Regions:
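Short, acidic Ser/Thr/Gly-rich low-complexity loop/linker segments typical of extracellular
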Residues: 57-74
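Residue-level marker for the onset of beta-strands and adjacent loop->beta junctions
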Residues: 52, 59, 113, 235-236
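Short Pro-Gly-centered beta-turn/loop motif in secreted/extracellular proteins
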Residues: 72-82
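Bacterial N-terminal signal peptides
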Residues: 2-10
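Short, ordered, surface-exposed loop/turn motifs in non-cytosolic proteins
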Residues: 37-40, 45-60
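N-terminal active-site segment of His-dependent metallophosphoesterases
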Residues: 28-38, 47, 92-192
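Extended active-site neighborhood of metal-dependent phosphoesterases/phosphodiesterases
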Residues: 88-95, 100-109, 118, 189-243
Length: 243
């Protein structure tokens, strides 16, 4: 589901608990953390300056950083796998191999986890940007070719990545982003590394939405069905503000 409202972009890949916003308590607003908070941390820019008003979520609850950039959530870590920020308008996050790093995985069996995030001020005006939209690469083994349903082999995907890099290189007056609308792999979880290999040299971040063919089809639960997607691309539900 994609929702564009006055330059704001919200990405949701699959059904999950709806996020509810909670406020920081008095301790956190004074720059201290409650010892009972399961998740906590600080959001700052790349110069070490705290950033107030950034939304931070565990996928179920959402809070906002205070004046000192601090945030905390009283989460049940047995039920949560990620903590992530909503990238605010005017900021970027570091990318690793083309994948934006706005999230951190919560280690298993942790009772408390500290997650700090660094945001970088976006260069130039935030009102102009280019989004390269892709959908349904549905990569298959090189030997598979293209069948009657047009599910593509990896070499066609590699050509697409090459075209995207060349196009992005011609856009120098505004930021470039990409969004893949799902079905990156066609039910073959062994191809995730091949898919991510195509992104590693991108100079722009690629955001993703999970598709039905990106789920483990015979998984016993929804959580297990998205495990491979999450391993490579992070949480299935998140938001980004542009413009």
């Amino acid at each position: 589901i994609f929702l564009f409202i006055i330059g704001a972009l919200c990405l949701c890949g699959c059904a999950d608990d709806f996020a509810t916003k909670i406020n920081l308590d008095g301790n956190s607003s004074e720059g201290e953390f409650n010892s009972e908070a399961a998740l906590y941390g600080t959001v700052q820019d790349n110069y070490g300056k705290p950033i107030a008003g950034v939304l931070v979520s565990d996928g179920m609850q959402t809070t906002e950083t205070d004046a000192k950039g601090n945030w905390q959530l009283f989460s049940d870590l047995k039920l949560r796998r990620f903590v992530f920020v909503t990238i605010p308008a005017g900021y970027e996050v570091p990318s690793k191999n083309g994948i934006p790093q706005f999230w951190q995985r919560i280690p298993e069996n942790e009772k408390q986890f500290k997650a700090d995030f660094t945001l970088m001020k976006r260069a130039g005006s935030g009102d102009r940007y280019t989004i390269l939209m892709t959908a349904d690469p549905q990569i298959r083994a090189k030997t598979a070719g293209t069948d009657k349903y047009m599910f593509h082999s990896i070499d066609i995907y590699e050509d697409m990545c090459k075209d995207m890099k060349e196009l992005a290189a011609t856009i120098t007056d505004r930021p470039v982003y990409s969004i893949c609308l799902g079905d990156m792999v066609h039910n073959n979880m062994s191809l995730w590394e091949d898919y991510c290999e195509g992104l590693k040299d991108f100079s722009f971040p690629v955001f993703h939405v999970i598709g039905n063919h990106d789920h483990i089809q015979n998984a016993a639960s929804d959580d297990l069905a998205v495990a491979e997607y999450e391993k490579y691309l992070g949480p299935t539900n998140y938001a980004v503000d542009l413009g």
